[in-house]
């Protein structure tokens, strides 16, 4: 296991006129040339989690975090991710740094996440076979895992635990 900084390098068009690159935390369009270079096995990672949150926005109200957890007892799941070592300016006060950066792949939300966050949800892996497939399979095969997690695999919970 290795600590990394969340947020892959932003596409060049996003950075025009900016002094910093805050990074991209969620990658959905895996056909983009910007992301394709990091989709091979050497740049894939998994991120363990027991809970995650999405912001729920209701018109006229402050966004609030809604937490999701696996339905299995004490279950750890994994986000499918990509990573790279990159030199950039993330924050002006830090200046230029070289970091291992990562982001999650995302997909259309399942029936549990969609009412809260209709845009997307992370790609979630559960089985040892899915983990191995994501980490080692050829790109076209690995990307078949970029699909919504089954509705019965997640539940809404109170807080981060």
Task: Name each region found by the language model.
Residues 48-49:
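A secondary-structure boundary/capping signal
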Residues 1-45, 69, 74, 80, ...:
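Short, His- and charge-rich active-site/binding loops that engage polyanionic ligands
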Residues 17, 55-62:
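Cytochrome P450 core scaffold surrounding the K-helix E-X-X-R motif
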Residues 52-54, 75, 85-86, 131:
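Short, catalytically relevant binding-site loops at active-site mouths
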Residues 97, 105-161:
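C-terminal accessory segment of soluble enzyme catalytic cores
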Residues 35-38, 57-58, 93, 113-116:
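Short histidine-centered beta-strand/loop micro-motifs
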Residues 68-89, 93-97, 102-106:
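A motif-centric signal for short, conserved binding hotspots located
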């Amino acid at each position: 296991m290795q600590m990394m900084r969340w947020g892959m390098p932003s596409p060049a068009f996003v950075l025009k006129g900016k002094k910093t690159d805050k990074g991209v935390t969620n990658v959905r369009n895996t056909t983009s040339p910007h992301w394709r270079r990091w989709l091979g096995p050497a740049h894939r990672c998994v991120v363990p989690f027991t809970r995650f949150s999405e912001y729920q926005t209701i018109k006229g109200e402050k966004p609030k975090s809604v937490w999701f957890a696996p339905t299995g007892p004490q279950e750890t799941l994994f986000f499918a991710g990509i990573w790279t070592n990159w030199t950039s300016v993330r924050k002006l006060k830090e200046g230029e740094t070289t970091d291992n950066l990562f982001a999650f792949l995302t997909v259309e939300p399942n029936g549990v996440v969609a009412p809260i966050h209709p845009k997307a949800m992370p790609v979630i892996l559960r089985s040892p076979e899915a983990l191995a497939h994501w980490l080692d399979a050829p790109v076209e095969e690995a990307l078949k895992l970029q699909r919504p997690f089954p509705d019965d695999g997640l539940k809404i919970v109170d807080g981060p635990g």
